[in-house]
Regions:
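Active-site loop-to-helix "anion-binding N-cap" substructures in soluble metabolic enzymes
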Residues: 2-141
Length: 141
């Protein structure tokens, strides 16, 4: 049933998306400077395109606070396939929702290659993210 939900949300979109996954490239000062110099001044029609930035977990609150362009979406780079509990170092989809996020990127090629995440794990994460009300940018290929 969750896969139908994913497909419905995926193929129902008529909008384009421009997403920037910052990976682990910016320091906090660089991230907020980029938001202020490049992201906040962007002019575009949010009915036609979604603009998404994806900072590291620790920078999410500062990026949310720094952005003045309310149309810009802040997404997490990953989430756990576990809910709340004793999962040291994991960030659950519920934590992401609590932080004010609506989107998460899952299945990135680097996580597949370096961390060795497989399709089964990514599907598990996707399912839990959707069940917790997150929208998913699902990377495949």
């Amino acid at each position: 049933m969750w896969s139908r939900t994913l497909l419905r949300h995926t193929f129902a979109r008529n909008k384009r998306m421009i997403a920037g996954n910052w990976k682990s490239n910016f320091t906090l000062a660089e991230a907020t400077a980029f938001i202020n110099s490049t992201i906040n001044p962007l002019k575009y029609n949010p009915n036609n395109v979604d603009v998404v930035v994806s900072p590291v977990f620790l920078h999410i609150p500062a990026v949310l606070a720094a952005k003045t362009n309310n149309s810009v979406i802040v997404a997490a780079q990953n989430c756990s396939n576990y809910g709340l509990g004793a999962y040291t170092g994991e960030v659950s989809p519920k934590h992401l929702k609590d932080a004010g996020l609506e989107w998460v990127i899952l299945g990135h090629s680097e996580r597949r290659t370096i961390i060795r995440e497989n399709d089964e794990l990514i599907v598990s994460k996707t399912k839990l993210a959707i069940e917790n009300g997150l929208r998913v940018i699902y990377c495949f290929g």
